Amino acid sequence: MSQTPPPNRLCAVTLDDASIGRSGADVEHERAIAIYDLLEDNRFTPVGDPGEGPYTLHIGLMDNRLVLDIRREKGSEPVVQHHLSLSPLRKVVKDYFLICESYYAAIRTASPTQIEAIDMGRRGLHNEGSTLLQERLKDKVEVDFDTARRLFTLICALHWKG
């Protein structure tokens, strides 16, 4: 017997094509996995929404701001659209990209102990970015930590320009 998923969740996530930087097959694959993981397990409730989900989320960038366009699964009317400054996330995302580059380089040449140390740092930065994102969203969208982690992954995947 299958369990009915909770209503306050995401049922679809898209990334704005115009916001996505050029990337190879590996990055495309990671984006697809991040979206799949997010849709499999998430808690997502727009603050103050009198209705209930499930919701669709379109993530993009506009005027150097993160745009979260939230709609109901059924219907095209927006529930809410949030525009968030990227400034608070910039440093952690930049550091995250740098450590990811080190991690991918280490996979080819470093010892397992070195790879593990870099990976621990990578996960720590990912957690830091997720906590910061969750804090930035708290008055707009209620998300649990795992959902914030998956959203942070997708925000990083945008490889915003500039």
From Swiss-Prot:
Sections of the chain in a coiled coil: none
Domain of life assignment: Bacteria
Pfam families recorded: UPF0262 (PF06793)
Homology family: Belongs to the UPF0262 family.
NCBIfam families assigned to the protein according to its UniProt record, in alphabetical order: PRK02853.1
Stated name of the protein: UPF0262 protein AZC_3148
